[in-house]
Amino acid sequence: MELSESEMLDLWKTMMQLQPAHYGCAIERTDGIDIDELLLIHIRKWYASLLLSAPDGIVPVEDVKDRLSVMVADNGVVTAMVPPECVRPVEWKLKAWQKSVTLFLQPNVPEAAYLHNEWTRPGVCDPAAVDYGNRILLFTLPDGELPIFDMARCVVRPTNGKYVFHASVLESLRVNRSTSQRRDDPILRNLDNSSFRVFDDLI
């Protein structure tokens, strides 16, 4: 699915059962709360979380190998600066490697520290990578080889402002409209505490 922000807002309202039942009515808010803006904040947070944590098969993934800024240190460690639309790496491979990497270590774990030691640093048979957010460190490039990438697949945030995801994630938008669920949801609490004036358009 690929939806604009307005289409996503309409879908969100439908899934949360917030669309008016009677389309012949005009609704005017009297408490000054912009419900659409509240919902958009909720939507943007939901989508950001989806991009960070969902399986790569249901969120947009692109090969960004041609958009990387790459540097190679004397010890063969490759630093690749990722483009701003990249949310997280999925699978990367240097042409000199015998296999790709799909596990990207966080810099604060002990395994990442071992990679910086020349005696425990991996080679082309069992490469490794550390994710620093805006850059990826790749271990290691053999002497005499160029840092050419076969792939650098990343989950990306669409640059056109669209919401792109597999239709299967819509189940997560379904909201139980029981009293307890509405009490726990701040968006729905705002709706319940609001004042509406409904005017029949036939009058």
Name these PLM-found stretches:
Residues 1-126, 130-203:
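Glycine-enriched, solvent-exposed interface loops adjoining structured elements
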